[in-house]
Amino acid sequence: MNVAIVGATGYGGIQAVNLLKNNKNYKISFLGGNKTSGSKWNDNFPFIYLDTDPYIEKISVENISKNSDVALLCLPNGISSTLTRKLLDRGVKVIDLSADYRYKSLVEWEKVYSKEAVAFKRNDDDLCKEAVYGLPEINKEAISNGRLISCPGCYPTSALIPLVPYLSQGIIENEGIVIDSKSGTSGGGREPNQKLLLSECGEGLSAYGLINHRHTSEIEQVASLISGNKIELLFTPHLVPISRGMHSTIYGRLRDPGLTSDDCRILLDNYYRNFKNITVLPVGTFPSTKWVKNTNQIFLSVKVDIRNGRIVILSVIDNLLKGQTGQAIQNLNIMSGFSMDDGLELTNNFP
């Protein structure tokens, strides 16, 4: 199967090339990047060497579609929407890593991504409704039948995977959910950003996007769908001075305050026992971002505060892999009829 990587020179695209270059199921048919178009891949990224040393090409529907079955769109918010319909019309399936199709309503997207809505005059509400939310652990069947997959954001991935088992079974209350997340600097992308300079963020920790971070509504949309009730929650992201990795701590109130840590761990373990990339830790073992660096793995831990009937769930992911491109490859595998984790048997080089 021929795969186009559009936006190949950003962090997401670079990860995609690295994951697909030796994958027997796929052939990289196109590498797109406007700023570096006309130059050879190996000159730009000698550390991800490609035997064919292809040219990086200008991004256009014609260039993408001429030899491709699927396009991975690793692009800033808004740009994917200018390409998607035309690619679909040419028979190219689309896996979008931006937020353009994460909402079932274009109106909702325009509320959350208001700056992009001004810059990109969209008229594709039908595609918003068609797009499948690409969280493989909860949406595998729909992904397998889809032609447009919208990959979740990194924060929503780290929050929803721990939450879904408890929301879907009514274990926790719909009100009072709090998500506290920390992310490495690569989550901000590869474009220059003063806040991500080493001298600005090194040896420090800071919150950002307080109350109104864009991923809040994305988490709420999926959580509400899973629970069958409208959910409003509190989400606070933080920037930590590591290159990659994400740690989320989720707090909720148990409907049955008699449930123990062991009860909640068993429930979590049973829910994800068939997923190779998810490890549910013993009660009292708490995960570190170091454990998942450069892998598509997720580590989960849960503990109950019996004094007040609250549950605390921890999750760690690599924000560039399970939080972005690794998850896109899972979706690609499912769409293509392969095992979900093919090509993602990645080993952590601890420490």
UniProtKB/Swiss-Prot annotation:
Reactions the enzyme catalyzes: N-acetyl-L-glutamate 5-semialdehyde + phosphate + NADP(+) = N-acetyl-L-glutamyl 5-phosphate + NADPH + H(+)
InterPro entries tied to this protein: AGPR_AS (IPR023013), AGPR_type-1 (IPR000706), NAD(P)-bd_dom_sf (IPR036291), NAGSA_dehydrogenase (IPR050085), Semialdehyde_DH_NAD-bd (IPR000534)
A Gene Ontology molecular function term of the record: NAD binding
Record pathway: Amino-acid biosynthesis; L-arginine biosynthesis; N(2)-acetyl-L-ornithine from L-glutamate: step 3/4
Cellular component GO terms held in the UniProt record: cytoplasm
Primary role: Catalyzes the NADPH-dependent reduction of N-acetyl-5-glutamyl phosphate to yield N-acetyl-L-glutamate 5-semialdehyde.
Secretion signal span: none
Keyword NADP: yes
Domain of life: Bacteria
Name of the molecule in the record: N-acetyl-gamma-glutamyl-phosphate reductase
